[in-house]
């Protein structure tokens, strides 16, 4: 998949660490999560114990890694980071765990992609702070138990449904990360402009925030691109007109949809009469992977009410048709109304 400026996935060019908040008090958004973490961190420090294991789950780009780093900083302990696909063997996990200091934070991104065999080794490490390893092969093989210092495992996943039940149940503090409100994103964008050292008016910040898809990572990326256009054009301070012109050049529309999103909507509308159409069929038609559609493209379209997921496939809503300048077929509106009523009765 080609790189998208509105993609919530991590991009090497996003590594501007100065834009990240350094404490829970500086962290904008996810208020309930932050308030709860403050309590748990204070209690752990008062007891002199390791914080219970934490699981952050939700769409990408919402601050899971940043919160994990802040937790370690506020606990006053070390921070180690890795990701699920990187840990291939039990020895890799053992090397990570045995090098931790007491109460350190170990962050595993994409924890749903851990090898099942690695999960089995991780269970006693999380529960009893012990590592059981098999040394050698055949008749000479023997089990070795390694005592570990108490530590905090922080897992992050964009697909909590793929976590096995035993692993999920070992996290004492599950935290759901939600998309950000426009006012929260405006505060993030305004702070980002100050950190990057350029003048941004309140209406300029609102324009960038409105197109950021409820995601701070996208907001930071759009802000840097708007800054580039403003520097070349010699415009300061950056107001809504400058931001609008820059974002239009990037093909990011008024609600944050880009060319890929509009292609997705048009494919359902024009090729399949608004749906329903299966995700595999859509992936083939758009030359994208199923995972890309489910994890990157669809979450924001669902949140905006542009599409519906049904047992028979994806359907375009009336607002989805309207956004691409088309009128929905009457029979499709009847189907959507029926599905809505069925959902309401099911609740």
UniProtKB/Swiss-Prot annotation:
Listed A to Z, the keywords are: ATP-binding, Cytoplasm, DNA damage, DNA recombination, DNA repair, DNA-binding, Hydrolase, Nucleotide-binding
Q: Where is this region: Head domain (RuvB-H)?
A: 254-347
**Looking at the keywords, is Repeat present?**
no
Would the keyword DNA repair turn up in this protein's UniProt record? yes
For DNA, which residues are the binding ones?
A: 290, 309, 314
Q: Where is this region: Small ATPAse domain (RuvB-S)?
A: 181-251
Per its record, what are the GO molecular function terms?
A: ATP binding; ATP hydrolysis activity; four-way junction DNA binding; four-way junction helicase activity
Q: Which residues bind ATP?
A: 19-20, 61, 64-66, 127-129, 170, 180, 217
**Entry remark concerning the domains of this protein:** Has 3 domains, the large (RuvB-L) and small ATPase (RuvB-S) domains and the C-terminal head (RuvB-H) domain. The head domain binds DNA, while the ATPase domains jointly bind ATP, ADP or are empty depending on the state of the subunit in the translocation cycle. During a single DNA translocation step the structure of each domain remains the same, but their relative positions change.
Q: Which parts of the sequence bind Mg(2+)?
A: 65
Q: Which GO terms describe its biological process?
A: DNA recombination; DNA repair
| Family to which this protein belongs | Belongs to the RuvB family.
What is the protein's major site of localization?
A: cytoplasm
Q: What is the enzyme's class at the highest EC level?
A: hydrolase
SMART domains from the entry? AAA
Lineage of origin: Bacteria, Pseudomonadati, Pseudomonadota, Alphaproteobacteria, Rhodospirillales
Q: Tell me the domain of life.
A: Bacteria
Name of the featured protein: Holliday junction branch migration complex subunit RuvB
């Amino acid at each position: 998949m080609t790189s998208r400026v509105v993609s919530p996935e991590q991009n090497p060019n996003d590594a501007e660490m100065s834009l990240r908040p350094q404490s829970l008090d500086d962290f904008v958004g996810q208020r309930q999560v932050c308030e709860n973490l403050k309590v748990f961190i204070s209690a752990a420090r008062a007891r002199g114990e390791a914080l219970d294991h934490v699981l952050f789950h939700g769409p990408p780009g919402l601050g899971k890694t940043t919160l994990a780093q802040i937790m370690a900083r506020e606990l006053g302990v070390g921070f180690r980071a890795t990701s699920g696909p990187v840990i291939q063997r039990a020895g890799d996990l053992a090397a990570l765990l045995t090098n931790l200091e007491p109460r350190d934070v170990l962050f595993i991104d994409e924890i749903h992609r851990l090898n099942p065999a690695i999960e089995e080794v991780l269970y006693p490490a999380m529960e009893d702070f012990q590592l059981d390893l098999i040394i050698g092969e055949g008749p000479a093989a023997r089990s070795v138990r390694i005592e570990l210092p108490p530590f905090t495992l922080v897992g992050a996943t964009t697909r909590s449904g793929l976590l096995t039940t035993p692993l999920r149940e070992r996290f004492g503090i599950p935290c759901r990360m939600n998309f950000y409100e426009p006012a929260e994103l405006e505060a993030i964008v305004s702070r980002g402009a100050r950190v990057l050292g350029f003048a941004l008016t309140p209406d300029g910040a609102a324009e960038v925030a409105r197109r950021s898809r409820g995601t701070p990572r996208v907001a930071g990326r759009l802000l840097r691109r708007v800054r580039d256009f403003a520097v070349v054009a010699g415009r300061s301070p950056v107001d809504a007109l400058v931001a609008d012109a820059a974002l239009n050049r990037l093909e990011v529309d008024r609600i944050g949809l880009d060319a890929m999103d509009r292609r997705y909507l048009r494919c359902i509308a024009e090729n399949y009469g608004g749906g329903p159409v299966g995700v595999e069929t859509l992936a083939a038609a758009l030359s994208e992977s199923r995972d890309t559609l489910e994890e990157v493209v669809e979450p924001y379209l669902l949140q905006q009410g542009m599409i519906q997921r049904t047992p028979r496939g994806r359907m375009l809503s009336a607002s989805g048709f309207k956004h691409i300048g088309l009128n929905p077929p009457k029979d499709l509106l009847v189907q959507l109304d029926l599905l809505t009523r069925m959902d309401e009765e099911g609740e």
